[in-house]
Structure formats: C-alpha cells, structure tokens
Amino acid sequence: MYHRLILLALIGTTMANVIPFSMSTIPEEYKEFIPEEVRNFYKDLTVEDKEILRELASKHATFANEDAALEALKAKSDNLYKNAVELRNFVKAKIDSLKPDAKTFVDEIIAKARSLRSDDGHKLDTEKIKQAARDIIAKYQALSEETKEELKVTFPAIAKIIGNEKLKRNASTFLQKN
C-alpha cells in the first residue's frame, strides 16, 4: 500500500507537468497534496490562459517535443509562456538534482504519463492508467531504500500523501483490476 501511494504521488506530480488541467476539478481535500508551485501556476491563470492551454493540449500530438509545445504557447501568450517555463524549470531542477537511479525512475514516470494522453483529446483510458500505475509500482519496489528515501525528500508532497489514510484507501480501490 505504501508503495502505491508514493507512486500515485509521483504520477500526480508529473502529470501536473505533462497534462494541463483545471485546479477546480480537484476535490478540496486533495488540493493540499499538489505542490505549491503547481497550485500557484494554475491559480494565476486567466480565462484566456485556460483556453490557450486547452487548445494546445488538444493538439499535443502535433508537437515534436516539449520545446515545440512551449514555442506554440509563446506564440499565443508571452506571459503564459514565461510562467510555464518557470514551472517547467522548477520541476526540471528537482529532477536534475536526483542521483542517477532516482532520476531514471522519475524520467520513466514522465514518459509513462505522457504516453497515457489521448491523441484525439478524448478522456484518458482508466485501464491504461491503472496498468501504468501497476508497472511503475513494480519498478519502484525494485529501487533501493536509499533511492526511495531520496524521492521522498526531493518531492515532499509525497510524505504528506503517505500518511493520509483516505488516500491510501482510494489508491487501493483504484488500482484493483476491475
């Protein structure tokens, strides 16, 4: 159970960097687990900013890479681009500070999260999300204790999630096969 929670936290953190979403869709009791920098980014979005993010998210398959997506964002809004780059740099700095095993693990989570996005902008496939989480859990369990501890220290929101009994129950229910 402990491992599932850590992984869901990491997935959540990386998904925030990968898939634009609205903070208003997150239940209040879970918002405290979103890193402050991510909350601030979404809190400061204007209606126009949200529309730009939705538009670009629906076209994500047309971008060769993250830099191409950021260039498209810059063409739409310099201010939104600046804020997105600031958030990206924050997350990138955390990832870059990790030792090789932890960094590789987080990079794999990001790649897995990106692979879950629908090319046509439709809803994410819940079964694919569950399978991705199971795959990541298996990889996490194979990590050394030192690497697991480094992940907890680098991503402190995880520590809050680990101790939350309601989230533990929800994670267990969500990851059941059917």
From Swiss-Prot:
One of its GO terms (molecular function) is retinal binding. The keyword Lipid biosynthesis does not apply. Residues 1-16 form the signal peptide. Keywords: Coiled coil, Lipid-binding, Retinol-binding, Secreted, Signal, Vitamin A. The keyword Coiled coil applies. Binds retinol and different fatty acids. This is Fatty-acid and retinol-binding protein 1. The gene is far-1.
